[in-house]
Swiss-Prot record:
Role, per record: Catalyzes the reversible transfer of the terminal phosphate group between ATP and AMP. Plays an important role in cellular energy homeostasis and in adenine nucleotide metabolism.
Top-rank lineage group of the source organism: Bacteria
Transmembrane segments: none
Pathway(s) annotated for this protein in UniProt: Purine metabolism; AMP biosynthesis via salvage pathway; AMP from ADP: step 1/1
Compartment list: Cytoplasm
Enzyme Commission identifier(s): 2.7.4.3
Annotated region described as LID, given as residue ranges: 122-159
Gene behind the chain: adk
HAMAP family membership: Adenylate_kinase_Adk (MF_00235)
GO biological processes: AMP salvage
Catalysed reaction, written as an equation: AMP + ATP = 2 ADP
Binding site for ATP: G10, A11, G12, K13, G14, T15, R123, V132, Y133, Q200
GO cellular component term, pick one: cytoplasm
Protein name as annotated: Adenylate kinase
Amino acid sequence: MRIILLGAPGAGKGTQAQFLMEKYGIPQISTGDMLRAAIKAGTALGLQAKAVMDAGQLVSDELIINLVKERVTLEDCKNGFLLDGFPRTIPQADAMKEAGINVDFVLEFDVPDEEIVKRMSGRRVHAGSGRVYHVVFNPPKEEGKDDVTGEALSIRADDEETTVRKRLDIYHQQTEPLVGYYKKEAELGNTRYSKIDGTQQVAEISKQLAVLLG
């Protein structure tokens, strides 16, 4: 079961990734984790990546693809894997295909921008404990204060509305074209593509995914 998750930041991919990992016994492959692990292990690719990053440059698609190729051969990937946050662009998707990394399912989590802004900009955090609230969906007992300590809640920089909108713009420009790419791949019989309504309840989405993936 080799799965790619697509969708804007805040569309609920992370929550469902946890469900899919547990249900199918597959690891989530994150390019950031992969880079850190390769650098820590001192592999040939890790050393290449470290040199590039130390020079303050971006790691090339080719290097990332080679890391993915190496990662999917490990024992924990024998039943499949879950890719979230990669590929981000069509050249990356093409490179993956050329490298022979095939995918069984591409799942797009569809949530309107305004709903994502509401979800993310409404988050409030208690810095000391990491407890997370939401002004609409999970409000604290007293506005702006942590339930346990009574201390003030704050907004993470990532959750500021302007930041959220910037991240959405990048997603629409860079990553959304992959939706069309994978729809076409599905028409050619190379993968299966499904669009999920990400505005539904978490449990409902999990139930749909279980039916869809079997």
